[in-house]
Amino acid sequence: LVQTVAKAVVIGWVLGCSLGFLVAIAIDRMPFLQRGLLPIASLTSAIPLVGVAPIAVMWFGFEWPSKAAVVVLMTFFPMLVSTLAGLQASNRLERELMHSYAASYTRTLWSLRLPSATPFMFAALKVNASLALIGAIVAEFFGSPISGLGFRISVEATRMNMTLVWAAVVVAAITGSLAYALLSRLERRVAFWHPSVRGRK
């Protein structure tokens, strides 16, 4: 059951987070985009999941792409907002120092601003790991006629077989917790130098 939903979760999570990151960089580089892109991005975050899932099935079919599309929609906005906040978190004096050395936008981004934004981005990655799992499971309620964790929960709940329902719920919870723990461990290795990470050790 977990293998069935894993492909949609992983691919949707990677695509959604990557898209959110790239749009955040574009908005930061060209601030005029903020007026056009942020309202649209905010709108996508407010779309009801139960309404999106059937539409995704109609567009992409019953296989994993429809679930991945729902996951992309759920994970895009948190990554966008967190990355934008992280890019603004670098110290103003440090930015002025880079400017005084005539550092380009790209050099400042890679040397100063992205490292400062790392904890913000990892926070979004961890939250999105749970959102991705939830999104894929809910999407399976509408578009997985024969398999999947969401399908199993739906079918067994209809049969009042609460044992299997709870088993599926526990599997989902454990999977989400493991993903969160792995990302937290990766964060400690990647951003070990950041005060917010050192303070958690």
Feature names for model-found ranges:
Residues 79-124, 150-153:
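Short cytoplasmic-facing helical segments at TM-TM junctions of multi-pass membrane proteins
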